[in-house]
């Protein structure tokens, strides 16, 4: 293979990018409304509910662990 045949695909990679221009081009950043405009209340409720559940479970487990520690070490 000739060296020029090997360099041809590389020259496309090194060429500056051509940006499309014209009135038909739209920016992808303005296609939708910002996510904070209308919160998804189902996701918000699910997230807060899960957080509360995990904290309650963590505190309950911690209290059980403390009681088990005291029982094993004769502190109770």
UniProtKB/Swiss-Prot annotation:
GO biological-process terms attached to the record: aerobic respiration; mitochondrial electron transport, NADH to ubiquinone; proton motive force-driven mitochondrial ATP synthesis
InterPro entries found in the cross-reference section: NDUFC1
Compartments, record wording: Mitochondrion inner membrane
Signal peptide (UniProt feature, chain positions): none
Transit peptide per record: 1-27
Key words, A-Z: Electron transport, Membrane, Mitochondrion, Mitochondrion inner membrane, Respiratory chain, Transit peptide, Transmembrane, Transmembrane helix, Transport
Topology term for the membrane: Single-pass membrane protein
GO cellular component: mitochondrial inner membrane; mitochondrion; respiratory chain complex I
Family: Belongs to the complex I NDUFC1 subunit family.
Function: Accessory subunit of the mitochondrial membrane respiratory chain NADH dehydrogenase (Complex I), that is believed not to be involved in catalysis. Complex I functions in the transfer of electrons from NADH to the respiratory chain. The immediate electron acceptor for the enzyme is believed to be ubiquinone.
PANTHER family listed in its UniProt record: NADH DEHYDROGENASE [UBIQUINONE] 1 SUBUNIT C1, MITOCHONDRIAL, NADH-UBIQUINONE OXIDOREDUCTASE KFYI SUBUNIT
Subunit structure of this chain's protein: Complex I is composed of 45 different subunits.
Protein known as: NADH dehydrogenase [ubiquinone] 1 subunit C1, mitochondrial
